[in-house]
Structures are given as structure tokens and as C-alpha cells.
């Protein structure tokens, strides 16, 4: 058997010296990663709950269900209003498209109340803006 060759460390050419770069917070890893914000209707749902039933609370699961409900209704109304605008060859969704979409999506008496409350809210907003 042949004798084993001695292992020698590989010789390296000296590396070029570069000016030391400033270490930033992200390079050192000390900066905390900011939590991504999740937009919900929770605060608004809570305010309405306190207006109607001041002594009643709401669980996190119930709040999640209510948030899903509001998102669902919003998407339905926005989708229907978008279709109505497209049918009329308009590129803008106005209050009229929203009102018609509400009448189409919500049943009977609920639609009437929603339209009257919506009209009241738009009037209040318009008078405050002027």
C-alpha cells in the first residue's frame, strides 16, 4: 500500500481589502419585523354594539363572524354595483349604483331600511363637507 500524502492547507492569495461598510439595523438583524396589519371592521362593530346594547359584550369568535358577514355583504354590493356600472357603460360607481345594488341584494323591508339609512348618511356627509 502506498503511503498517504500529507495534507497541507491550501494556500490562498490575500483577499483585497474593502472599506468597511456601515452596518444597518437590517444587516445586523436587531430590527424587529413589524407585524402585518390586518384590516377589520371590529372597532366599528363594537361601536354599533355599544350604541344599541351598552351593557353587552362580544366574544372574539362572534366578532370574527360579524367581520366575515360585513366583508361578505360589502363584496356582494360592490360586485353588483360594478356590474350595474358596466351595463350602463360607466367607469365610476356612484351612490345610485350602490343604492340599486342594495335593492337587488337585500330582501324587502331590509332593503328599504338600508336605503333610507344610506341616504341619511350621504346627506350628513355632504352637509359636513360643505
Curated annotation (Swiss-Prot):
The modified positions for Phosphoserine read: 11
Q: What is its main location?
A: nucleus
Q: Where in the cell is it found?
A: Nucleus; Chromosome
User: Renumbered to this chain, where is the cross-link Glycyl lysine isopeptide (Lys-Gly) (interchain with G-Cter in SUMO)?
Assistant: 7-8, 17-18
- Output the Pfam families linked to this UniProt entry: Histone
Record field: compositional bias (Basic and acidic residues): 1-19
Protein function: Core component of nucleosome. Nucleosomes wrap and compact DNA into chromatin, limiting DNA accessibility to the cellular machineries which require DNA as a template. Histones thereby play a central role in transcription regulation, DNA repair, DNA replication and chromosomal stability. DNA accessibility is regulated via a complex set of post-translational modifications of histones, also called histone code, and nucleosome remodeling.
Q: What is this protein called?
A: Histone H2B.1
Amino acid at each position: 500500500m502506498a503511503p498517504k500524502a500529507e495534507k497541507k492547507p491550501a494556500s490562498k492569495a490575500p483577499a483585497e481589502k474593502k472599506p468597511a461598510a456601515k452596518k444597518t439595523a437590517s444587516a445586523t438583524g436587531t430590527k424587529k419585523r413589524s407585524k402585518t396589519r390586518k384590516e377589520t371592521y371590529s372597532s366599528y362593530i363594537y361601536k354599533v354594539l355599544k350604541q344599541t346594547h351598552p351593557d353587552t359584550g362580544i366574544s372574539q369568535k362572534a366578532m370574527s363572524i360579524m367581520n366575515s358577514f360585513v366583508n361578505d355583504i360589502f363584496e356582494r354590493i360592490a360586485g353588483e354595483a360594478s356590474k350595474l356600472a358596466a351595463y350602463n357603460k360607466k367607469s365610476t360607481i356612484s351612490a345610485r349604483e350602490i343604492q340599486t345594488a342594495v335593492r337587488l341584494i337585500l330582501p324587502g323591508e331590509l332593503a328599504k331600511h338600508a336605503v333610507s339609512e344610506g341616504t341619511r348618511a350621504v346627506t350628513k356627509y355632504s352637509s359636513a363637507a360643505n
